Amino acid sequence: MLVAAQLYKEEITRKLRATWYDLKYQYFWQGGCEDIDIPNNNYWKKQFAFLDNEGNVTGYFSYNYCPEANSINNFGLISFIDYNPRLIQAVIKHLENALSQGHINRIEFFAYEDNPANQGYQKMIKRFGGKQVGKLTKCSRLLDGKLHDTVFYEIFREDYLKKNWSKCDGWRREKE
């Protein structure tokens, strides 16, 4: 279950610090580590802790919100356990709700091309009617000391609704 990160600020900070020098988290940290700011509001940045059935924090999800463009960008997604499919399901449901209910019109994010999670991002992009819109080659040096390619993705609400119209009450209302 996704809940406000502000409720678990100390635990999230401690768990994130524990990942700083672990190579498997290099794609989240992008070559450098510092404490994540979890402010006492959620106007520009939405931040969530993911809780398992026992109430343990097993993941963190965040994004920036731009009210002028009604869009979100700059995702942060990290699991503190190796296998966490419920976290992914919760994130996808959150994004689907935001798109289908009209809370946002656009999603953009990037990923390192060789990140194992990128395969999942590509499936999500296809499912949501989005597309890869760019690629930068050898643009970021990560913890492994290598330069990595970055790919950029974009999803528009209207494309999501066309692809997933049967799930979206808002789409049916717009068509009437």
Language-model region placement:
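Active-site rim helix/loop that mediates acceptor-substrate recognition in acyltransferases
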Residues: 26-52
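Acyl-donor (CoA/ACP) binding surface of acyl/acetyltransferases
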Residues: 1-18, 47-176
